[in-house]
């Protein structure tokens, strides 16, 4: 899962929203460096990643990608699943996406102690409405382009959009089957 799904699943309180994002930016053991609510959300983020990586429906989705794209298929699928969530937001959330993202951006903008890499991208995330923009399929090309700049072999992501176009319907169906199970997992995750 990518940013939007983690934020959606991680809880709506400010500390939970922050921790849901921090999960991609904070590595190693958590030993009281953040408030308990933030650390709890980081732990949930990590557990969501493990649940997702081990789920048979995700294995099916990953197997749809060509062998040349398999190395980074997990990254591409995470981004695509955020697109599916944004596109079909009303099926999975009670509040409109624009209100949800506005709350996330408000919390993010008011936090002064963001992890270093998140602090660098947060202003761009807010200014360009990264989370809301996932509704538009073509935005994924920009997202994947940004990710590819951090990879050792960026050329392997170069044709990912062509593959996503080809796999759009089957991967969308994979998401429709998988996401409710992920919601149940997150809802039943033990909180501290």
Which residue ranges define each predicted feature?
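An N-terminal structural lobe/cap that precedes and organizes the functional/catalytic core
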Residues: 1-93, 162-192
